[in-house]
Amino acid sequence: MTVANRRIAVYPGTFDPITNGHIDLVSRAAPLFEKVVVGVAQSPSKGPALPLEQRVQLARGALGHHSNVEVIGFDTLLAHFVRSVQGGVLLRGLRAVSDFEYEFQMASMNRHLIPEVETLFLTPAEQHSFISSSLVREIARLGGDVSGFVPAAVLEALRKVREAKSAQS
């Protein structure tokens, strides 16, 4: 078994798309750890709007200014991924009290699967507390302005998805 390293944090998510809220959380976590691994999950059951490789590239573009942040796509059980990168801390964001019940359940399950790893919850900066990838996708799909919620490269990717869907209709 791989030994967990408490100086390596893993921040998993679908990141469909990565938002300014995600970026803020990573930016605040990066100084706390030797390394932060952003694990971009395949998550086929969620039916992502953007393919895994594009989500990985967008996250790398948004987070590339952090020398201790690595973005990796994965399609395995989270516990296996965390062990493969020798993570010792699992980072999770809590935007609102409504997130807590789900995140508490996930933390409890992860404690059973990877007992050597601790889950650490971070709250977002106030200006990002209402941002979610699903809301961003829905607003973008309906032609709304999401420029205040995502980096420019993500905005462009969402525009292309919308145009492609419009062309199919």
UniProtKB/Swiss-Prot annotation:
Superkingdom assignment: Bacteria
EC numbers, comma separated: 2.7.7.3
InterPro entries: Cyt_trans-like, PPAT, Rossmann-like_a/b/a_fold
Residue numbers marked as site, Transition state stabilizer: 22
UniProt keyword Cytoplasm present: yes
This protein's record includes keyword Magnesium: yes
Keywords assigned: ATP-binding, Coenzyme A biosynthesis, Cytoplasm, Magnesium, Nucleotide-binding, Nucleotidyltransferase, Transferase
Catalytic reaction list: (R)-4'-phosphopantetheine + ATP + H(+) = 3'-dephospho-CoA + diphosphate
Subcellular location: Cytoplasm
GO biological process: coenzyme A biosynthetic process
Residues binding ATP: 14-15, 22, 93-95, 103, 128-134
Family: Belongs to the bacterial CoaD family.
HAMAP family: PPAT_bact
Function: Reversibly transfers an adenylyl group from ATP to 4'-phosphopantetheine, yielding dephospho-CoA (dPCoA) and pyrophosphate.
Protein name: Phosphopantetheine adenylyltransferase
